[in-house]
Amino acid sequence: MAAKIRKGDKVIVLSGRDKGRTGEVFEVRPDADVALVRGINMIKRHQKQTQTQEGGIISKEAPIHLSNIAIVGKDGKPTRVGFKVLADGKKVRIAKSSGAEIDG
């Protein structure tokens, strides 16, 4: 299946404790249907000290399910993603709400 949400996309959270917040996707894990969004779904982890890294409590992003995020359209609202094949045979993502190309 084609990736509707990709690395670098600006997304908005649809549900959960961070509902309504926006951020940039910096990692997508298609096998688990989750993504990591910068500054969203932050958790605290107790880090054991190593030779290169000092120990303590660190904050990091936890994965968020793809069904709980949506791409932000040009108007700043969440939009669904569709696909369109151009005349030259190239497949591009489009915003369902406006019909505008997302990438390409």
From Swiss-Prot:
The keyword Ribosomal protein applies. Gene3D superfamilies: 2.30.30.30. GO terms for molecular function: rRNA binding; structural constituent of ribosome. PROSITE patterns: RIBOSOMAL_L24. SMART domains: KOW. HAMAP family: Ribosomal_uL24_B. One of two assembly initiator proteins, it binds directly to the 5'-end of the 23S rRNA, where it nucleates assembly of the 50S subunit. NCBIfam families: rplX_bact. This is Large ribosomal subunit protein uL24. It comes from Rhodopseudomonas palustris (strain BisB5). The lineage of its organism: Bacteria, Pseudomonadati, Pseudomonadota, Alphaproteobacteria, Hyphomicrobiales.
